[in-house]
Amino acid sequence: MTFPIRRAWGPAAALIACALTLSACGDEDAADNSPTFVNTEARGTADPLYGKETTSAAPAVSSAPPAASSAPSSSTEPPAAAPSGDVQAVLDRIVAEHGDVGIAVSDGTTAIEAGRTAPEAAWSTSKVPVLIAANRTGAADGQLVSSAITYSDNEAAKAAWAALGEGAAAAQATQSVIAEGGDTATQVQSQVTRPEFTAFGQTMWGVANQAKFMAGVRCVEGAQPIIDAMGVADPAQAYGLRTLPGALMKGGWGPSLAGGYDVRQMGIVQLDGHDVAVALIASSPDGQYASAQSVRTSMAEALAQTETQWPSPAC
């Protein structure tokens, strides 16, 4: 069965309330929110999955043009893999320049990572495997996929999770997708661990394993509609990896247990004319969502301006 979801941005009063204070909002899994982006991931009542990651107010996006070409690679052969030390040095430099961040790239088999590499809450990036799993069962029509992936609508993602049976059944179906993509280590959370957020949004997913998954996702059965939706830009989320030409990506955001605000992105982007599977995590220096957006955009610019032989995705 399908769960058609109509984009409803919510009452104006709710948006204004969220815009006035971060504490009044939930979060991504709660509802991607912040004073700048009013997203249900930080809303509490809209868990990156209890509500809808609705955004308002334009995000801070750098005006500097990305160095990567927007044209797809014309090469029929993937570039030779760079010595891991070269790419490692690039990632280490980006981390050193941006503080409390993590980054990883992968070819699907191995990953090169730097900074915050321990598994942390996936927030709405977990919607990618959830929607792929739902699509496999025929429960995710085009409108549901677009709502949950392009616009990070939490209600749409919750509908997909429910269609999978919720709890252990949904977690197993979602985990099978992640494993098929190349990440056999991550365990999908089946139970709610933070009352204001969804179970799957609190899946502990490290940047290295996210990059591995993205390197193999195009070979995963039933993934294409979700990948297509990842390539459609939502103007309210135009920061970080989304600033790079042709990016296929999904973001997620929410409050950390330490009291900060985390923003995550994973995707396939073009660097130096070639596809690269990458995952990022950053915390805002002042606890504000908008600040974390700026950090993510700066990290993306640093990737685009670097010339090296990045690892090529397996798919």
What are these regions (language model features)?
Residues 2-68, 74, 78-95, 140, ...:
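Structured C-terminal helix/loop/strand segments within mature extracytoplasmic catalytic/sensor domains
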Residues 75-81, 113-120, 144-147, 157-165, ...:
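Second-shell loop/turn segments in exported
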Residues 96, 135-139, 149-157, 161-166, ...:
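Sec-exported extracytoplasmic/periplasmic mature domains
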Residues 96-119:
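Short, conserved catalytic-motif segment at the N-terminal edge
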Residues 106-108, 134, 148-153, 160-164, ...:
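Active-site-proximal beta-strand/loop segments in catalytic clefts of secreted hydrolases
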Residues 119-139, 148, 278:
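Active-site SXXK
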Residues 163-219:
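Mid-domain, small-residue-enriched loop/turn segments at the edges of structured enzyme/sensor domains
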Residues 212-255:
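Conserved active-site loop region of the serine DD-peptidase/beta-lactamase
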